[in-house]
Amino acid sequence: GAVGEIQILLNNIASQLNGDQKKADKV
């Protein structure tokens, strides 16, 4: 459903933000 798709998009955004934070921590 639409709600599930939105949750997936939010999860993708969250994972991308987490990845950016991890990269920043390494620097």
Swiss-Prot record:
Its main location: other. It is found in: Trichocyst. One of its GO terms (cellular component) is trichocyst. Belongs to the TMP family. Structural protein that crystallize inside the trichocyst matrix. This is Trichocyst matrix protein T4-C. The lineage of its organism: Eukaryota, Sar, Alveolata, Ciliophora, Intramacronucleata.
